[in-house]
Amino acid sequence: MERPLWVRWLKVYAIGGAIIGSGFLLFKYTTPTDQQLISQLSPELRLQYEREKKLRQSEQQALMKIVKETSQSDDPIWKTGPLQSPWERNGDNVQSRDHFAKVRAEEVQKEELARIRNELSQLRSETEEKTKEIVQDKQVKSWWRFW
């Protein structure tokens, strides 16, 4: 004897719900959080991430400013205004990318220069101390003094 149609549909919905629910639970409990991902990065990549964090935030703020300006205008949605469409072949979009790349490169250069300056000042202070020690030793132990 065949089961009623509603029993078969109930079985389909129950199995489908179980598949979807188990997929959701697997996704929720197996995907790492942002902090876990950052903590697992190598120290160099973590440092680079922290350095470029402000740049990404400023880039996002600039994008949100453009989106707000575009949403307040009466122009149709396909007229993006200062925000260039990725399908257009203008060089304006490339210029904004270049601008952010230049800003990023300048920040990296400034940090590198600061690090080099710190190392240089440490070396100068160390050599200055050693030079003073050598001069004091020479004054105390002069080869031409007999007394």
From Swiss-Prot:
Keywords: Chaperone, Membrane, Mitochondrion, Mitochondrion inner membrane, Transmembrane, Transmembrane helix. The keyword Metal-binding does not apply. The chain crosses the membrane at residues 5-27. Residues 73-94 are annotated as: Disordered. It is a single-pass membrane protein. Its main location: mitochondrion. GO terms for cellular component: mitochondrial inner membrane; mitochondrial membrane; mitochondrion. It is found in: Mitochondrion inner membrane. Disulfide bonds: none annotated. It comes from the Eukaryota. One of its GO terms (biological process) is mitochondrial respiratory chain complex III assembly. Present with 704 molecules/cell in log phase SD medium. Belongs to the CBP4 family. PANTHER family: ASSEMBLY FACTOR CBP4. Essential for the assembly of ubiquinol-cytochrome c reductase. It has a direct effect on the correct occurrence of the Rieske protein, core 4, core 5 and apocytochrome b. This is Assembly factor CBP4. The gene is CBP4.
